[in-house]
């Protein structure tokens, strides 16, 4: 199953691989029909981005709200169990519970998402560890990878075999590719996959490929003791407050986006006294919650200014803020009802938020946060 833009190196190279392996390729009609098309095609392999998996995860979570009594308790017991799945290191007790959950719950979920997946490649951004574990547990094997267009477009990827695929890591380096972590925690690499340079732009090329041939990715990361790469953020996105404290927005956003109420979030605060955020709620989940709790509103704008809705997000802040140092905690936020999408230019083709566009588009709202 293919649905990412073919102009993007990530999808294009994987399509070349499908052709090489003799696969039949089915193209989704559009992003909105992916779930429906998966049921029609029953694919064995798919390349995707974490945002698509997050939406599947959220839909499965929301579906449990329709259950009642013992069925509902069993549904969410299985849901929580899946989040703690380990590929090679589960206890005998966990495996027994997993076997029961698979018989009663996971088998139905697999059927709902095609029922035939053997490999799901996730790239373009980091997937949350508990979500990768969840899909592995229910029988939708997620293989995480990492790279850039400049690296053709992969430098590390999870692989079959004990210890080569661990949720939250992007696997070991590809054969023939060297990866190092600099003193600034930047990921740099060298290998035959690295580009020769930017077309007719030697100055920009020199900015990313040093004299020793190392390509500087601009991303930060670290290795596990077993040699698996973990992505921790984007070097240029790390900023400093007016008090000289560094903040990595990626780590904060990753935690807050575990909330079913939050679809996307951008942490701000460069040269400011504190960290703040623009939050795009998961409007489907939020509206369903309001319906179940009889919270009335007239439109999206009135929904996001409703006192009960504000209370919900204040509670989420109190839940996640303690996970961070005082200077990293979100002190102010604004809810944004406008959809963040590829069509309106806020998301990249791999569904990552364009921070510069956010800062331009919501300048007045951001200024208000720091008044």
Set out the residue ranges of the language-model regions.
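Conserved ATP-binding/catalytic segment of the ANL
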Residues: 173-241
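Adenylate-forming
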Residues: 194, 228-257, 286-307, 326-330, ...
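Conserved ANL (AMP-binding/adenylate-forming) active-site segment centered on the GW(Y/F)…HTG consensus within
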Residues: 163, 167, 194-218, 252-253, ...
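Active-site loops of AMP-binding adenylate-forming
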Residues: 136-141, 148-167, 201-204, 283
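Conserved A3 ("GATE") glycine/threonine-rich loop of ANL adenylate-forming enzymes
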Residues: 8-10, 51, 124-131, 144-161, ...
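Conserved C-terminal "lid"/linker of ANL adenylate-forming enzymes
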Residues: 239, 264-267, 289, 310, ...
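C-terminal boundary motif of the adenylate-forming
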Residues: 220, 225, 259-285
